Structures are given as C-alpha cells and as structure tokens.
Amino acid sequence: MPRPLKMSYGDQKPPYSYISLTAMAIIHSPQRLLPLSEIYRFIMDQFPFYRKNTQKWQNSLRHNLSFNDCFIKVPRNVTKAGKGSYWTLHPMAFDMFENGSLLRRRKRFRVKQLEKDISNWKLAAAANTEMVTHYLDDQLTQMAFADPARHGHVLANASAAQMSPYKATPPILPTTVTQLPARPKRAFTIESLMAPDPASTPNEGLVPMEYGSPDAVALEKPPFNLPFNFNELAAQYQLYFPSFFYNGQYGNIPCYQKTPPLFHNGPLPVF
C-alpha cells in the first residue's frame, strides 16, 4: 500500500501527478471508489494549493481520468441519490507505484480492449446489485493467489473472499419415458393419403418404459452429433476468463440473481 501522506506542503504545489492524486483519493476511501466531486474534495482538503484555480486543475484531472486505463468508470446504482458515476482503480493497477510510493510510478498502465469491455460489463452488473466492493476484493484476492510475492501488500486491505466455481442447477429427470405411437402404414395413393387416420383412444398405442432402460436411452439420443458440448465450452471460457463467473457466496441474495446472463451472443456493452 502507499506510504503515509506528507501534509506539510502548505500553499506549495505538492510533487504528485494528477494520476497519483486521484489514486491517493481512491485508495483512502473506505470502498475504494469515489465520485468525481469527492475526488476533488479530498485533494482540496489535503493540499491547500488546489483550493485556488480549481477549474484549471480539475479539467486536467478529469482528462487523466478519462484517458488512463488504470481508472475505471463505475455506473451509479439507480437506487442511490445523486448524479454522475463513480471512479475506481483497475484491480491490476493497485500496485503500479514502485515500493508503495505515490511519487514514483511504473510505465504507463495499459489494458487490452477485450479485457476492458469485460471489466466494464462486470462492474455495470455489480453496480446494479451493489456488489462493486465485493468484486474489487475478489479481483485483488485472485491476483494475490497468482503472485503472492508481488501482490502481498494489496492483500493487507483486501478481504479474503472464498472463491467457488459457478454451479448450474441439475435438471429434473423424468421417471418414465413415453414412446409415441407409430402412424399406420397405408397405400401410396391420393385417396389413401388424404383419408383421416382411424379413430383411437388417447392412450392407445403409448408404451410406457422405465427411465434408464435400453429403449428409453435410445429414444433420448439426438439424431445427430452436436458440434460442441456446452459444459466443455463453459469450462474453456472459465479457463480463459476465470473472474467472469460470479462467486457463489452471493448467489442467495435475491437482487444478485437479476444480473444479466453469463453467456450471450451479442457484443459486450461499452460504458
């Protein structure tokens, strides 16, 4: 984590970049995300230099927020009062400052467009269910397990979330399988083809079979082989995007079950 702040600059300009000032405000917030107005307030409260000429430096800071991948825009929950979105640090950017010093930053943090789209989609879904803080904690915990030496200092302030794979509810299988009656054979003539079928009772010709019998298994097999297996596809998707599956520990919350489906054919929304 960043070192304690030095508050003795007085009216002098502190030696921090706008990226460092913004990261400083976000890191010191309880939920690690703030609206733009709160970021401004934190900077002015800590550094008197920024209490004057506010329009100039606020425009520059807002420009840095929009054009740096280390910051993520989180939509505001519709149930909360106020306007404007929240801002937070990308989960992989919490350690972008060398040795925890906000004065020294590593090379510019960049994120691939696909990863950015997926992250925006997840944060939008988390904002609708008020789970943004849990999402950030889970991302930090996964990073620490992947590289404990590098991300050990981040775990100090990240709650240890229990990760559990996505589990689908097994379908309810029927106890019996009913075989449909075969249509009676008839001569290949116009009169025969246009004639109605002979009357029969609703259950006549239906042969009940026990589930699991050879005849029932033969009826359950599709007439062709599918080009892929859905479970295998889901396993491969989880391999390349492990954090795309939500944690099962929040699955019992009613509002949490209203999130968009995990798999869809349309493009990922960009916020």
Curated annotation (Swiss-Prot):
Tissue specificity comment: Expressed in early embryogenesis in 14 symmetrical pairs of segmentally arranged neuroblasts and in developing peripheral nervous system. Also, later in embryogenesis, in a cluster of cells in head region.
Gene Ontology molecular function terms on file: DNA-binding transcription factor activity, RNA polymerase II-specific; RNA polymerase II cis-regulatory region sequence-specific DNA binding
Q: Which domain of life is it from?
A: Eukaryota
Which compartment or compartments is the protein found in?
Nucleus
Alphabetic keyword roster: Developmental protein, DNA-binding, Nucleus, Transcription, Transcription regulation
The answer to whether keyword Magnesium applies is no
Q: Determine if ATP-binding is one of this entry's keywords.
A: no
Q: What does this protein do?
A: Involved in development during embryogenesis.
Record's protein name: Fork head domain-containing protein FD5
Specify the species: Drosophila melanogaster (Fruit fly)
Q: What is the lineage of its organism?
A: Eukaryota, Metazoa, Ecdysozoa, Arthropoda, Hexapoda
